[in-house]
């Protein structure tokens, strides 16, 4: 924290109890607790930038103006077809932007501030055909914002096409092709997924190999999803059965 103050002496710091950061479970509870967001009601948005995130562009104001309440890197998974990725939703919370007031409202409405669901809520989620992790008692913060919040008509989650311009996490090389070799606003877990892709890019941003510490993480097994897009020579895609093209050739 002192390093930040050396760069920006006027930086304001809000401290939280250490127990919130002792393990993933406690951190997830914090991220779903209205008390966190009520500390920042003087602001419209919170940008969550965990230690393994990185910002490429000065676009924060732009993203705050996009009329979405939650945005993070899209969840995509490789398939047996090298041209095909399975899109499961939006998105990762390690580098994410949330609307403060709307998040408070949604948390209070769904009564999930403590990170727990009732039997009735779990049954409802099962009827919706959601992934099995959605029905466990402790709901991960990523899952909460990307799926549970979709059931609140007043809470807006970013679309895939918005999220892919906001951040990469899984399958960054494929998403880079999809975006016609344009980097997003930022990324998350760049030291864990596809290091061969990230090392040259991070070198361009001043991070030499000696400064990069990797903890390699295998990509999670693919589970059922509804949205499929196909990668071809220049990222010609088909999303949800509708053809789209990122170049002039659409063969």
Q: Where does each model-flagged region fall?
A:
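Active-site-proximal specificity loops/subdomain of glycosyltransferases
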Residues: 2-44
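A short acidic, often aromatic-flanked loop/helix-cap motif at beta-alpha or helix-coil junctions
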Residues: 16-25, 78-79, 165-169
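Long amphipathic alpha-helical coiled-coil/heptad-repeat bundle
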Residues: 43, 85-86, 130-133
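Short beta-strand-to-loop acidic/aromatic patch adjacent to the donor-nucleotide binding site
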Residues: 43-55
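Short His-Asn-centered micro-motif
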Residues: 49-50, 72-74, 92
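Conserved donor-nucleotide/metal-binding helix-loop-beta segment in metal-dependent transferases, i.e.
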Residues: 54-85
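Catalytic core and acceptor-binding pocket of nucleotide-sugar-dependent glycosyltransferases
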Residues: 90-242
